[in-house]
Amino acid sequence: MYMRDTIAAISTPPGNGGIGIIRISGGSASCIAETLFRPVRSGGLISHRFYYGTLIDIQTGAVVDEVMAVIMRAPHSYTREDVLELHCHGGMLVVERILSLVLRAGARLAEPGEFTRRAFLNGRIDLVQAESVMDIISAQTDAALALAQRQRGGVLSSRIAEARQLLLHALALIEAYIDFPEDDLGETDVESIRSSVEGARTHIRRLLEDFNEGRLLREGISVLIIGKPNAGKSSLLNRLLNENRAIVTHLPGTTRDIIEETINLGGLAVRLLDTAGIRHTEDVIEQEGINRALEKIPQADLILFVLDGSRPFGPEDRLILDALQGNRFVAAISKADLPRVLELPSECCNLPQVSFSAESGEGVDDLKSTVRSLFVSSQAIDNREYVAISRVRHRDALSSADGSLSRFRQGLDSGASLDLLALDLREALASVGEVTGQVTNEDVLDLIFSSFCIGK
């Protein structure tokens, strides 16, 4: 990957559409515009202004398409390089033909995420903000989008910068005494160092505490719906989806394969998996569906154990309950519109329990609230100022920083040498810097930006 190259890519999704966009970034962007674009009005292209005209194949002189062109000159662009965008009709044939002409005019095809990578390397955004671009694109709920937008706006980066400044202050005091060994570390400076480090550690630990919520908002959760035949699993799925996605009959064993659908559960993306009814059967195909359902149990974030409230707790329910031990699950008691017959065994007393009727909708909202509350707080969903780390990379780096600060505190209390204390602080600073990209390496950047789409 060469930063001096001019890169180009299609920035709109594949397939036919109303508009297609080809994005070009680099030193040759203006030259490519002059070569291929013929504006209706003569004169040079002013930065950040759209121009209507035609796109020409310079080898044949033929008009390829009518386009709108905009040049955004460095450093006032997404990449802080000259950026040219060509907006054409959205047919794939014309979009790909224009891209081929741009490549022939001197650009090369961009790699996945290369535009955003250049924005990072050129100092326009930090690494957290770069990652948030992909999170904005892939967000499935308003809460996930709001979190990504706050990260993109620099709120998380500011929190991390505050911790970093406190650590730099402490390190500066220690290094001053290292440079002038004839002076002893005074009590006032010791307390100032301790206060700065503890302040930084508080910032870091608060972010670590919110990691699971941040990750779940970004990634969502998987919820497995499991139960014996005719317990009401597929009816519950249909009610949650507000559509007849699964076939529902009075015949047991109707659902044989796993049905997957995603819903927005009050700000939390939930992947629902409806499964075959669990029972002993001689039907080979049905048994395969049962085996697949049982295999999904340890992979799910939560299991909704659907029990028929109008029938006694039976051997099939016991079989499922035994299979669920050690996993997180909710007892979802169906058919609340019928007289209650079910009595749960004693080991279910401390479980979350919700009665519902898929027929009338009674209790379904309570079930949704129960599921959501097990994973995220109302603050994470509703507070527009909420910010959290949301990636394992963030957590690992901050956990490493917290470990370094723990060693620092122990060393400070036990009278360790200033050199060792400074080493712990430098390690903590390096770990904190990994989050925003102040300290990084090419392998990490390759891993992050390879997940982006081409053209972003």
From Swiss-Prot:
Binding residues annotated for K(+), in chain numbering: N230, T249, L251, T254
SUBUNIT field: Homodimer. Heterotetramer of two MnmE and two MnmG subunits.
Binding residue positions for GTP: 230-235, 249-255, 274-277
Main enzyme class: hydrolase
GO cellular component: cytosol
MF terms in GO: GTP binding; GTPase activity; metal ion binding
Function: Exhibits a very high intrinsic GTPase hydrolysis rate. Involved in the addition of a carboxymethylaminomethyl (cmnm) group at the wobble position (U34) of certain tRNAs, forming tRNA-cmnm(5)s(2)U34.
Binding site for (6S)-5-formyl-5,6,7,8-tetrahydrofolate: R23, E85, R124, K456
Record keywords, A-Z: Cytoplasm, GTP-binding, Hydrolase, Magnesium, Metal-binding, Nucleotide-binding, Potassium, tRNA processing
Cofactor (UniProt): K(+)
Species this protein is from: Pelobacter propionicus (strain DSM 2379 / NBRC 103807 / OttBd1)
Family: Belongs to the TRAFAC class TrmE-Era-EngA-EngB-Septin-like GTPase superfamily. TrmE GTPase family.
Compartmental location: Cytoplasm
One Pfam family matching this protein: TrmE_N
Membrane-spanning ranges: none
Key word tRNA processing present: yes
Binding residues annotated for Mg(2+), in chain numbering: S234, T255
Alphabetical GO biological process terms: tRNA methylation; tRNA wobble uridine modification
Full protein name: tRNA modification GTPase MnmE
TrmE-type G domain mapped to chain residues: 220-376
Cofactor note (record): Binds 1 potassium ion per subunit.
